[in-house]
């Protein structure tokens, strides 16, 4: 009986320890190891194929700010805008000219984005709506010359009048013309001023312009980015070190940028946003480099979330306050002079794109309140305008995400150009975009049945074993308690036999009790049939 209790206690304790060690230590490590071997950019793997050509489109939304009082604004009035959108596009991503470097464990490739207008999702918008915006060529040209080449203002003003006859500070055109088909630029004039101005188009300095023939160009915000090379990347494949998977080594064949007045701001941090390493820590954040703004941005953990019943973590980001963060001072025009820093929640893109453009969150969400006060019609809120990513750390899978960014013009009055001399100094919103993804069941099921099913089985197994082991240990403890608490009295066989004999004898007649005589009490181990012993026992 004692041996059985010890066996039960030992077995239960062993199961308990096994459940703890295997369930919380061994199994997760095995799972992480298996994932790390599968999630690499090694040729021939499923992950490599999905990464090289995304088999589903991302959603790409464009919201444009239509200026409803352009004449008033041109004379110094406060802008009033009306948001129109979303114009919905299917964005397909693919990579080409892939070259592996086995020694360095890197892969080089060119990124390409293709936008296809989704008429059904955009309805009732068609793309043919007339939009009024700050003139995308006249205003930037005038502001740039005033800031950097004021001595050339007279020449540039004459050139603008030739190339853009009858142009105003604001331009009304169809949405598709602004963003994809293009605004016509006529460089056919033989005037010296016009030829000097058109040089920037012929040399390719205006990246958004496409040459149609020998004298004409088409300018659009996104046309040149559609189905064209978005830059050459070199990233780690993650075969030798899975923690480095996707991290950018070079962009445009350079190990760092030469855009900002500070090494820290010129670094490539993170991935190209199409892949992340598995098994990251929550506090690491999700970092990605965005060529459009020449900057790496990091999303930070916000809260726990879920997607189709699967647990995930919600990450978010904003542009921060450049003047308040010493690490971001290199995004100021002069890092030593904080007055040259952009307002809170914005980023000066002029060193990156060469024009007076500013980036921000949509509707200046989390920006300086003055930005919102300067323009009527803005209504920032977290639901519609915050950046978010629902991310699963163990597999490195983004379940859903919305990357949102607004582009603005840094407007100021230009004395040398009649159409712009009365403008207010403010940051004028132009449009904002959202690039997002929501994984469908085909791909969420891959995660669910390869990762979460294993985790659920492990959880069920370890808790079952822990429960059984606790029941076993409690049962063993109860049995030990009963053994120690019980009074186990056993008489020798001879005494039991003699006692039975006495019990079977006829009862003697009642005699008068002698008060002074002690009562005869049977004493264990004493032979009561012996008169001498009985006599000693009485006295």
From Swiss-Prot:
Q: Which GO terms describe its cellular component?
A: cilium; cytoplasm; dendrite; neuronal cell body; plasma membrane
| Cytoplasmic side, ranges | 1-7, 481-539
Please name the PANTHER family in this protein's record: SCAVENGER RECEPTOR CLASS B TYPE-1 SR-B1, SENSORY NEURON MEMBRANE PROTEIN 1
User: What is an annotated GO biological process for this record, any one?
Assistant: detection of chemical stimulus involved in sensory perception of smell
**Does the entry annotate any disulfide bonds, and if so which pairs?**
265-330, 294-352, 332-341
Which residues are listed as membrane-spanning?
8-28, 460-480
Q: Show the InterPro entries listed in the entry.
A: CD36_fam (IPR002159)
The entry's family comment says: Belongs to the CD36 family.
Cellular compartments annotated: Cell membrane
Which Pfam families does the UniProt record give? CD36
- What is this protein for, i.e. what is its function? Plays an olfactory role that is not restricted to pheromone sensitivity.
* Name this protein carries in UniProt: Sensory neuron membrane protein 1
What residue spans carry the region label Disordered? 500-539
Q: What's in the keyword line of the UniProt record? A: Cell membrane, Disulfide bond, Glycoprotein, Membrane, Olfaction, Receptor, Sensory transduction, Transmembrane, Transmembrane helix
Q: List the GO molecular function terms.
A: scavenger receptor activity
Q: Which domain of life is it from?
A: Eukaryota
- Glycosylation annotated at which residues? 66, 186, 213, 226, 440
